[in-house]
């Protein structure tokens, strides 16, 4: 339901959809206890059917246990740090953590692109028995015709994706048919990884202190500017809008403000370079939006050209994020033992010397 200001301006309500967040960066701004984590969990629920992998970095998790029951403990980190390469007095652990994620996602992206090659999928399709092809040829022809007639690049990309999904669906439904066929290495590779979902959800919850040294690093900029190429959906929770530099703030696809003062501060800040019209609009609507549990949402590239919305989301009920295979692996490697950071200089005061 839209809200109306005293001057008659409308503030539509936003119903979150997966396309708002998939392969994009979302930033939530607001002090503690203003509902940031409630929104994160709501977004997680929306993304659950589309993303099978998740990593959470939440320094406050040991005390507030915000993600308990939603994310398996093995996928929650209390700091940005790559444990398997820890060195004494090493300040690059956070950078290596992000580099490891990026390298893995780059590989996942490469495999996904190879598997979804249209020519390879068509080759595999034509290796199916004739009766199966005859049954599916009508649907294939419709999509091929739409693809050939399309001149709009974005629509053509959507039709190409539809074509890929249709071919994959037919191949997967009949995958047992390939068992006794003579196949090339590329064909075997495609069949082996045809169900691969490369997408990852990365949540950085109140990590401002650890993120600050990374703002000038190329690896962190990649996560902001190139994450869609590696199928990374990123959510960052900040206490204040100044927790991120202006160049990164402006590049977030979705910005969610849980507090009126931080919202006003963000849009009035000179370094963010919002138009005078936007500043005046935010000043007028802030008094109306931030009542009860309502928040303000700003979408940078809005297909409706509205950009500003109000939103209220329900309290989340527990669910386990991740694929069945991921959760099975997590349970297999999980240890309830509390891990002590032995690189902490105070460890020497407590360790036992036998």
UniProtKB/Swiss-Prot annotation:
InterPro entries: P-loop_NTPase
Keywords: Late protein
Domain of life: Viruses
UniProt induction comment: Expressed in the late phase of the viral replicative cycle.
Membership in a protein family: Belongs to the asfivirus B354L family.
Record's protein name: Uncharacterized protein B354L
Organism placement in taxonomy: Viruses, Varidnaviria, Bamfordvirae, Nucleocytoviricota, Pokkesviricetes
């Amino acid at each position: 339901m839209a809200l109306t200001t005293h001057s008659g301006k409308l503030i539509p309500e936003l119903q979150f959809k997966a396309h708002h967040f998939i392969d994009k960066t979302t930033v939530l701004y607001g002090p503690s206890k203003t509902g940031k984590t409630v929104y994160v969990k709501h977004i997680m629920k929306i993304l659950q059917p589309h993303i099978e992998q998740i990593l959470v970095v939440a320094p406050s998790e040991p005390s507030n246990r915000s993600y308990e029951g939603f994310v398996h403990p093995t996928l929650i980190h209390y700091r940005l740090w790559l444990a398997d390469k820890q060195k004494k007095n090493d300040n690059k652990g956070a950078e290596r953590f992000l580099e490891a994620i990026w390298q893995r996602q780059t590989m996942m992206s490469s495999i996904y692109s190879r598997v979804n090659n249209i020519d390879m999928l068509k080759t595999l399709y034509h290796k199916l028995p004739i009766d199966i092809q005859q049954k599916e040829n009508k649907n294939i022809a419709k999509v091929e015709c739409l693809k050939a007639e399309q001149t709009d690049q974005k629509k053509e990309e959507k039709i190409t994706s539809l074509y890929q999904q249709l071919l994959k669906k037919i191949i997967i439904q009949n995958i047992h048919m390939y068992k006794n066929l003579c196949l090339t290495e590329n064909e075997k590779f495609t069949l082996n990884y045809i169900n691969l979902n490369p997408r990852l959800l990365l949540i950085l919850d109140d990590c401002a202190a650890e993120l600050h040294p990374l703002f000038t690093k190329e690896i962190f900029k990649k996560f902001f500017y190139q994450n869609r190429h590696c199928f990374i959906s990123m959510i960052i929770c900040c206490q204040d809008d100044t927790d991120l530099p202006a160049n990164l703030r402006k590049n977030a696809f979705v910005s969610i403000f849980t507090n009126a003062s931080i919202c006003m501060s963000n849009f009035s800040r000179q370094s963010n370079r919002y138009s005078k019209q936007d500043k005046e609009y935010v000043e007028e609507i802030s008094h109306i939006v931030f009542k009860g549990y309502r928040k303000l949402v700003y979408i940078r590239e809005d297909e409706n050209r509205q950009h500003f919305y109000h939103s209220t989301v329900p309290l989340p009920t527990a669910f386990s994020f991740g694929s069945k295979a991921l959760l099975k692996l997590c349970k297999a490697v999980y240890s309830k033992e509390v891990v002590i950071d032995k690189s902490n200089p105070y460890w020497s005061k407590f360790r036992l010397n036998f």
